[in-house]
């Protein structure tokens, strides 16, 4: 994370002077799992606001029909969708409407309206990666049951002037951790929880 070209590439993509780490995640899908990752965008899951990108890395080779699909251009829709859980039958947190001053909608039913969208998918080998805007809708497009365990790793990175902006109650657990470390609504994504990964000299 700290000693790789990753944040410099993020800075180029976001036209940023500085890149801070927002969070990293490790995803595991068990062999035989029939549950698809729901279509969602990461921006509404947590109390973060600003220009951010996600680095997505497969930890084993993946064919495009088995992997994640991205809805082309969805980062430009200027819409916020409610958080959809990956478990619990893809339960949606909250109700559509105005929450903390922002309008949230139900995520469109991508799977039932595939012809309405253009999708981006790739065959990937170990060592390949994808960067995408944190507002981009993505999820599982094809009902493929993995024969082996599937592992993915992601990094979320933020451009300077990104902020902590409180969203719905669904983010309260992560919010409590931030508040326990001295952060509050409106603070910059910087400091000990969000270290600087890259800064132009």
Model-derived segments and spans:
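Short, conserved beta-strand element in jelly-roll/cupin
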Residues: 40, 47-64, 123-126, 131, ...
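Double-stranded beta-helix
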Residues: 64-137
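Feature marks short, surface-exposed loop/turn motifs that line or immediately flank catalytic pockets
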Residues: 30, 63, 77, 138, ...
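Short, surface-exposed loop/helix-turn segments at secondary-structure junctions
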Residues: 40-41, 105-116, 147, 168-173
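Short acidic (Asp/Glu) patches
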Residues: 3-7, 32-43, 52
